[in-house]
């Protein structure tokens, strides 16, 4: 027989489901028995398959992955503590090219009620835009905790906690602050709506860029009917530029001869620019906009590649630098 506590907890969740709640953020699920989560999530989703369970577990990778395997729909990640270009490449490669790609659905939160990351503490507005751009374009799901959009970041001394944590007091916020990045958040979410490639963390290929302060990557759906290139500066203070090299898998996915011209439609731009060959250039100013998003498509007249021979298994897969 099932423990009475398990049934009571399941019934508490169903009460809120009946009230219209469909997303549950579960605090520290790794401190509860895994068999309970496997049973409870399966039972609830058997009745209500649209219910989402988000695992708020900052713990060892093995346990985070086990929670995903027993049924959690989405998971918190180590994105909050990834800061350098190499760290992003290594972590996203783990999530997209390793075993976790089959069962782990990351949700990139830029901050949480409990975590005020050191890279945001007393940082300029541009740093908040950078972190939002990274989360919104690298992950299929992303989130922010109230106050991020107006640059709230004052910490307790030598701590990753907020000095005036909303957990302990009611907050009255000035939503008209000049530092407000609501327009950039809306712009990023608009890009996500327009480009299915940005609605998943998969289909990711990093481009080789000659500046460690500039991260460049391409995301594509399996059919290559949605392909975007993204460049993000990791420097919130100074303009940065980079030459970057697109991977040959991009042309294979389009069915083109390698290096044929591509039309690059930058977000909100009226006209496309033509990218010829693998090597391209980008310049980013954090005081204007520290990121760029392009929709890529074959240029009119681009030469098509010959059909592959039967049994030719070459195809782009996973993330690589």
Protein language model features and the residues they cover:
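Active-site neighborhood of glycoside hydrolase catalytic domains
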Residues: 1-64
């Amino acid at each position: 027989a099932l423990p009475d506590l398990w049934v009571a907890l399941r019934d508490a969740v169903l009460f809120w489901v009946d009230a219209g709640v469909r997303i549950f953020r579960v605090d520290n699920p790794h401190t509860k028995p895994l068999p309970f989560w496997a049973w409870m999530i399966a039972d609830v989703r058997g009745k209500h398959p649209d219910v989402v369970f988000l695992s708020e577990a900052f713990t060892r990778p093995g346990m985070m992955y086990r929670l995903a395997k027993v049924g959690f729909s989405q998971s918190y990640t180590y994105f909050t503590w990834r800061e350098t270009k190499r760290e992003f490449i290594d972590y996203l490669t783990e999530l997209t090219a390793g075993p976790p790609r089959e069962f782990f659905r990351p949700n990139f939160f830029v901050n949480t009620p409990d975590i005020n990351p050191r890279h945001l503490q007393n940082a300029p507005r541009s740093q908040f835009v950078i972190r939002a751009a990274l989360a919104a374009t690298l992950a299929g799901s992303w989130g922010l905790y109230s106050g991020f959009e107006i640059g709230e970041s004052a910490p307790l001394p030598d701590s990753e906690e907020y000095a005036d944590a909303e957990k302990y007091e009611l907050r009255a916020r000035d939503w008209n602050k000049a530092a407000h990045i609501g327009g950039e958040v809306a712009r990023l979410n608009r890009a996500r709506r327009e480009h299915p490639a940005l609605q998943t963390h998969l289909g990711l290929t990093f481009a080789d860029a000659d500046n460690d302060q500039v991260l460049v990557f391409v995301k594509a759906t399996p059919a290559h009917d949605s392909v975007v290139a993204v460049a993000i500066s990791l420097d919130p203070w100074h303009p940065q530029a980079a030459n970057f090299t697109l991977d040959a898998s991009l042309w294979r996915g389009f069915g083109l001869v390698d290096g044929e011209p591509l039309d690059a439609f930058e977000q909100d731009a009226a006209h496309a620019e033509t990218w010829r060959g693998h090597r391209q250039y980008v310049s980013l100013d954090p005081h204007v906009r520290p990121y760029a998003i392009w929709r890529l498509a074959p240029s009119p007249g681009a030469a098509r590649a010959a059909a592959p021979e039967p049994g030719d298994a070459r195809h782009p897969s996973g993330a690589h630098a």
